[in-house]
């Protein structure tokens, strides 16, 4: 037979202890009937009064240690108390908001006054590669000739007259003869494959093919007409023409 469980009502709330009740050596434990033991402690000591201008009394001890309490103005060190102290620094002047432009250093080779700097050697002038310089010179000469041709020669600047060099009597009047060197140098030229291919397929190749085709056709015609031009063929033709059928 199962034992019936005794029903208990809701638990009564625990009575709050007195404010500031902290168990100390002078605390006493008392118990009352139908109640839990209560702790009766001695009245807590009053906290020390906060310093003037300090944190409020509601702050905890840990928070009081980290709070900064400003001191009075009389506690500050005054410069007048120190005879050897330097004079106070003047207040900084108001600076403009926009930064002043920095002076740029002169380029290398230029002195402070704008002239050439004797201590710095002059830089080497820029020179074009030989191929580009030659192309530029040829182009300039070609454009000058075109300009003179279009202008018709009017107003064109005359070329400067070159002073004639007097012929020295030591110079022989006969022209110099060409002398061939006994040493021959062979230099291999490099050509493009496309240029060589075009040279092989040029006009001379076409003419050679035409000549070969003409010889072949002449040989074929000679093989057909050749037997008719021989002496035997001529005699047969004359005998056939002298017959009675052909007589008038």
Swiss-Prot record:
It comes from Human herpesvirus 1 (strain 17). Sequence repeats lie at residues 161-163, 164-166, 167-169, 170-172, 173-175. This is Neurovirulence factor ICP34.5. GO terms for biological process: response to endoplasmic reticulum stress; symbiont-mediated suppression of host autophagy; symbiont-mediated suppression of host cytoplasmic pattern recognition receptor signaling pathway via inhibition of IRF3 activity; symbiont-mediated suppression of host translation initiation; symbiont-mediated suppression of host type I interferon-mediated signaling pathway; symbiont-mediated suppression of host-directed shutoff of host translation. InterPro entries: PPP1R15. A motif (Bipartite nuclear localization signal) lies at residues 200-218. Residues 161-175 are annotated as: 5 X 3 AA tandem repeats of A-T-P. ICP34.5 is detected as early as 3 hpi prior to viral replication but reaches maximal levels late in infection. ICP34.5 gene is therefore classified as gamma-1 or leaky late gene. Residues 190-248 are annotated as: Important for interferon resistance. It is found in: Host cytoplasm; Host nucleus; Host nucleus, Host nucleolus; Virion. Residues 175-188 are annotated as: Interaction with host PPP1CA. It comes from the Viruses. Residues 73-83 have a biased composition (Acidic residues). One of its GO terms (molecular function) is protein serine/threonine phosphatase inhibitor activity. A motif (Nuclear export signal) lies at residues 128-137. Residues 45-58, 84-93, 119-128 have a biased composition (Pro residues). Residues 1-14 have a biased composition (Basic residues). Residues 1-16 are annotated as: Required for nucleolar localization. The triplet repeats region may play a role in modulating virus egress. Interacts with host PPP1CA; this interaction forms a high-molecular-weight complex that dephosphorylates EIF2S1/eIF-2alpha. Interacts with host EIF2S1/eIF-2alpha; this interaction is crucial for the specific dephosphorylation of EIF2S1/eIF-2alpha by PPP1CA. Binds to proliferating cell nuclear antigen (PCNA), which may release host cells from growth arrest and facilitate viral replication. Interacts (via N-terminus) with host C1QBP; this interaction allows C1QBP to be recruited to the inner nuclear membrane by ICP34.5. Interacts with host PRKCA. Interacts with protein UL31. Inhibits the establishment of the immune response and of the integrated stress response (ISR) in the infected cell. Plays essential roles in viral nuclear egress to mediate capsid transit across the nuclear membrane. Facilitates nuclear egress cooperatively with host C1QBP and protein kinase C/PKC to induce lamin A/C phosphorylation and subsequent reorganization. In turn, lamina disassembles and nuclear egress occurs. Residues 1-129, 149-174 are annotated as: Disordered. Residues 175-188 are annotated as: Binding to PP1CA. Keywords: Host cytoplasm, Host nucleus, Host-virus interaction, Inhibition of host autophagy by virus, Inhibition of host innate immune response by virus, Inhibition of host interferon signaling pathway by virus, Inhibition of host IRF3 by virus, Inhibition of host RLR pathway by virus, Interferon antiviral system evasion, Modulation of host PP1 activity by virus, Repeat, Viral immunoevasion, Virion, Virulence. Belongs to the PPP1R15 family. GO terms for cellular component: host cell cytoplasm; host cell nucleolus; virion component. Residues 24-35 have a biased composition (Polar residues).
